[in-house]
């Protein structure tokens, strides 16, 4: 997790840890807890308070190549699992590859499968990197699962798109369409709720254009949804075109995605000529195109020396002969 405390690797050992309990009702993901969990090994147990009730958790370790079969994300977790791509997890994957998972997830066992309340991003990162997935498993009811899920989302907030889906569900199922009542319950303004709900109406293929869904703000999502009212098929087609460009290696900034999507609403293409785009030819080798200009960016630590020398040789041919 991007802002979660990191468990130093050197604190790990294989000595059993006796059951303990936290006397304070604070959320379990605190510094003192991280230090205690860091020394746990498979099968060790710890007792923690969740929603004011003590829960005994046992550390289980799932193999990365089977984590998606032996676990699932709890249905009450609002994070959209389909949007957890390598780009969206770029804050986790490097550390998983280097040192493995640092902070255990939380979940419960249901019919032989572990349901994850907190740790869906780490679960996907473990699957993508085929790393071990560490989960503290306890007997949890839905209230406790919801509390742990919210705790995890405090470290890596869900997007306006994901929150909008939850708001829309609550608005219909719990508040009979009364936005004011929902706003009071969520302790946020009606405007924010309305913007998030409108953002959630966008096709998922549009949200997937961004590196991670959090790049699309509620304000921008709301404006985009309103701009394409009764024009959803046009929006989907443009999103499909941009996805094809991404597959070819083009990298878009968040602002560029929105500009390119809305450009199809204009009859003239003149406004598109000055847009910039970035193409990645290989790891460490990208080119930025902007109007008539092209900017080459090479990472000498990742691009072979012979390739850089060839590029330099071509550039030297452009040098004007000395007078």
Curated annotation (Swiss-Prot):
Residue numbers spanned by region Disordered: 1-20
GO molecular function, one term: DNA binding
Pfam annotation, one family: SoPB_HTH
Biased segments, Polar residues type: 11-20
Keywords: DNA-binding, Plasmid, Plasmid partition
Biological role: Control of plasmid partitioning; required to recognize the cis-acting. Binds specifically with the DNA segment containing the sopC region. SopB is trans-acting.
Additional remark text: Overproduction of SopB protein causes IncG incompatibility.
NCBIfam families: parB_part (TIGR00180), PRK13698.1 (NF010252)
Annotated family: Belongs to the ParB family.
Protein name: Protein SopB
Classification lineage: Bacteria, Pseudomonadati, Pseudomonadota, Gammaproteobacteria, Enterobacterales
Name of the gene encoding the protein in the UniProt record: sopB
């Amino acid at each position: 997790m991007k802002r979660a405390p990191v468990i130093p690797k050197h604190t790990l050992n294989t000595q059993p840890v006796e059951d303990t309990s936290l006397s304070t009702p604070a959320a379990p993901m605190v510094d003192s807890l991280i230090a205690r969990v860091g020394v746990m090994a498979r099968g060790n147990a710890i007792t923690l308070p969740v929603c004011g009730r003590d829960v005994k958790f046992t550390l289980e370790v799932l193999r990365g190549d089977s984590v998606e079969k032996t676990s699932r994300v709890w249905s009450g977790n609002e994070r959209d699992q389909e949007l957890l791509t390598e780009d969206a997890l770029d804050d986790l994957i490097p550390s998983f590859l280097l040192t493995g998972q640092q902070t255990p997830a939380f979940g419960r066992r249901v019919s032989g499968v572990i349901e994850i309340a907190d740790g869906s991003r780490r679960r996907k990162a473990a699957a993508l990197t085929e790393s071990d997935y560490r989960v503290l498993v306890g007997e949890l009811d839905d209230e406790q699962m919801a509390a742990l899920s919210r705790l995890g989302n405090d470290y890596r907030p869900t997007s306006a798109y994901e929150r909008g889906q939850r708001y829309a569900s609550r608005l219909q199922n719990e508040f009979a369409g009364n936005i004011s009542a929902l706003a009071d319950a969520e302790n946020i303004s009606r405007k924010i709720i309305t913007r998030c709900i409108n953002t959630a109406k966008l096709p998922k293929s549009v949200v997937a254009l961004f590196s991670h869904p959090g790049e699309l703000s509620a304000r921008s999502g709301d404006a985009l949804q309103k701009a394409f009212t009764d024009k959803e098929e046009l929006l989907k087609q443009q999103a499909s075109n941009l996805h094809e460009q991404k597959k070819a290696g083009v990298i878009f900034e968040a602002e560029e995605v929105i500009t390119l999507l809305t450009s199809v609403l204009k009859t003239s293409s003149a406004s598109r000529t000055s847009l910039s785009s970035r193409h990645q030819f290989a790891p460490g080798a990208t080119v930025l195109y902007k109007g008539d200009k092209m900017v080459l960016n090479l990472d000498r630590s990742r691009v072979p020396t012979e390739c850089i020398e060839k590029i330099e040789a071509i550039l030297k041919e452009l040098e004007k002969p000395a007078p």
